[in-house]
Amino acid sequence: MSNYVNDMWPGSPQEKDSPSASRSGGSSRLSSRSRSRSFSRSSRSRSRVSSRFSSRSRSRSRRSRSRSRSRRRHQRKYRRYSRSYSRSRSRSRSRRYRERRYGFSRRYYRSPSRSRSRSRSRSRSRSRERSYYGRAYAMARGRRYYGFGRTVYPEERSRWRDRSRTRSRSRTPFRLSEKDRMELLEIAKANAAKALGTTNIDLPASLRTVHVAKETSHGIGVSSNGAKPELSENVTEDGPRNPSEKPSQQRSIAFSSNNSVAKPIQKSAKAATEETSSRSPKIDKKKSPYGLWIPV
């Protein structure tokens, strides 16, 4: 009985050597192996997933970089009128002009590289200082600011043809003929008569209608009757005489023993009036529109 109890007791050697114990040990070994295999599989799957995520992140970063580059290229088209871009273009143009004008190489005019570690406050203060002058320059050049004065876009140039449809499209100045001028003068006379309530208005000499004599190829004026007008002393057949030229007259000079200075002989008033009357041009009052002109 005691042997039976000892055999059935949990700490007995029979239990250790029993097949059930060996089976439990083998199952534990199998479970540990399966656990290690599953752990290795899970680690492999995790590594694969992490590699996939890393590859995806790399592809995303590459895509974002390409997109940012494309955006930058696209924005360069619209940065054409920005202040910084215009300054760089003006500087490059000035350098090119100096090189072409004086034949210097670029290394003498190459400015030192600007450090990118400038603070934003410094750049903002400079932009605020120059904003007023930049805006005034842009308004003078016909441009308009957008977005807090950062970007400048050119205004559409309104052509002079689009301003009013009544203007003629030809750029040559509009000239009136003599007939049109006479018609406009008659219309102005009629309007003035209606406004003042008078029928007959005495116009000044500058506004009176004058029949201009037709000039022939010889330069002689011919009136409407066909009569040849008389030529005055100032106008000769060869051409008009210069009024500044005085007629050469030889005056008799009187000498006296008391005074050594030569003096011309004074003529009488009657002889002087006869000379002036002979010098004055013969003008017909009926033919000339301005009447008789008295020489001063």
From Swiss-Prot:
Report biased composition (Low complexity) as residue ranges: 20-31
Entry's Gene Ontology cellular component terms: nucleus
User: Which residues are modified to Phosphoserine?
Assistant: S12, S111, S113, S280
Please give the residue ranges the record annotates as the region Disordered: 1-131, 156-175, 217-296
InterPro entries named among the record's database cross-references: RSRP1 (IPR029656)
Composition-biased stretches (Basic residues): 32-125
Pfam families referenced in this protein's UniProt entry, alphabetically: RSRP (PF17069)
Q: Its Gene Ontology biological processes?
A: spliceosomal complex assembly
In what way is this protein post-translationally modified? Phosphorylated. Phosphorylation at Ser-111 and Ser-113 mediates the interaction with spliceosome proteins.
Q: Where does this protein have compositionally biased stretches of type Basic and acidic residues?
A: 156-165, 272-287
Keywords from UniProt, A to Z, are:
Methylation, Nucleus, Phosphoprotein
Q: For bias kind Polar residues, which ranges apply?
A: 245-261
Modified positions (Omega-N-methylarginine) are R141
Per UniProt, subcellular location reads as:
Nucleus
Purpose of the protein: Probably acts as a spliceosomal factor that contributes to spliceosome assembly and regulates the isoform switching of proteins such as PARP6.
Q: Which family does it belong to?
A: Belongs to the RSRP family.
Please report the name of this protein according to its UniProt entry: Arginine/serine-rich protein 1
The gene designation is RSRP1
